[in-house]
Amino acid sequence: MKKPILAALALCYALGAAAQTPDTAAPEGYRFTDVKILPVTPVKDQSRSGTCWCYSTLSFLESEILRAGGPELDLSEMWIVRNIYFEKAVKYVRLHGSLNLAVGGQAHDVLHGIEAYGIVPEEVYPGLNYGYDKPNFDEIDAVIKAYADAVIKAGGKRSDSRLTTAWQAGLNGILDAYFGPMPGKFTYRGREYTPASFAASLPIDLGDYIEFTSFTHHPFYTEFAMEVPDNWNWDKVWNVPLDEFMQIIDNSLEKGYTISWGTDVSEKGFSRTKGLGIVPEADLEG
């Protein structure tokens, strides 16, 4: 039975909602009560990288592993990011640049990444091969974009418009330089694994998870490819009415399932420093 656990919604700002706007907040501030506490792993720092989609979804899967009776794990975000970046750059070149080539992504990218490339623990592949102890993608993003654009431009100048046979190897060379070479085998907690066998050892089935959203420009109870730049792979999500969307969340939490929530932290109702996401009564201008 498929479990409606993965949730994505761009109409709301965050899980924490309140009736007051930030400008009219009560002097004592917002008060929160723990209603349901579920097992989770420690929060990780994505630092200067647009990889929230990967950190949040792997955190969700780590919680799912705990729920299923598995051990507490710290899975490698950069393993997924590195592999998805390769796929995204290839598609960007194939479409002659008509695709969003940035580090952003969505929850289904993580599920696809594990299915296609397996997964490894953080200690096996931290993905920090460039002199920093936390992710910093200022240079990585610029280099990958410049390389892909150069490949497109050079191909367009050739009489046959062909790409060279070396460009994907060059892309992999850039990714390996920044993230590190990907291990084919590794030893973890006394056992030898491949990335695929380690993924297979986890007590979860990636086919069990479904993405939901709530938009009014597509029919409800149908799938559609959400039209946002980060959905670079054009994966589909199920569209349901907003009240049912919230019921899915409440029901999942009540039955002991955590969720993965995709949202837009650039909205004015979100404060990173205060750790609050607020849906105001009145529309915010701009």
Language-model region placement:
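Hydrophobic h-region of N-terminal signal peptides that target proteins for export
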Residues: A10-A18
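Sec-dependent signal peptide recognition
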Residues: K2-A8
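Generic cytosolic/nucleocytoplasmic N-terminal low-complexity/intrinsically disordered segments
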Residues: M1-K2, I114
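Enrichment for repetitive, rod-forming helical segments
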Residues: L9-A10, G69
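Catalytic-core signature of thiol
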Residues: T21-G286
